[in-house]
Amino acid sequence: PIATGERVTSLAAFRDLFAARACAVCQLDITHCGGLSEARRVAALAEAWRISLAPHNPQGPVSTAASLEFGFSQPSYIICETVHEDVPWRQDVVREGFVVEQKGRIVRPNTRPGLGIEINEAEVRKHPFQQELLQRVFGSDGSVGDW
């Protein structure tokens, strides 16, 4: 099966992708497609086309919590990409409300309210965002390309 959609940013673009039968798995990215409300609309459209959901999620702990909770609320959810060892201080900045079981890498829904995480704001301030790589590509004609 073909999985795609991590760089798709609008409901209309997902509609075109699904209508073309271009994928079997939709990898919408909540941080790119317009947040939880728009992701819900994309998921409903995917379900109408019988397309599974596997949220794309290479971001941090807030995105992970949102992607997991969103996935658990969707009937066509099959798997979620997660990153847990992205930075050595991750456990210092957030207490996550879910556990990844080592056998099978299974995650169960958390039982806490909201996204189920607690953010340590003081610790977050110790690690300001720094862009490692400028994610902008220009073609020889000056057009902006996909990073």
Report each predicted region and the residues it spans.
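Extended hydrophobic packing segments that form well-structured cores
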Residues: L115-W147
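Shared catalytic-loop signature of beta/alpha-barrel
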Residues: P1-G114
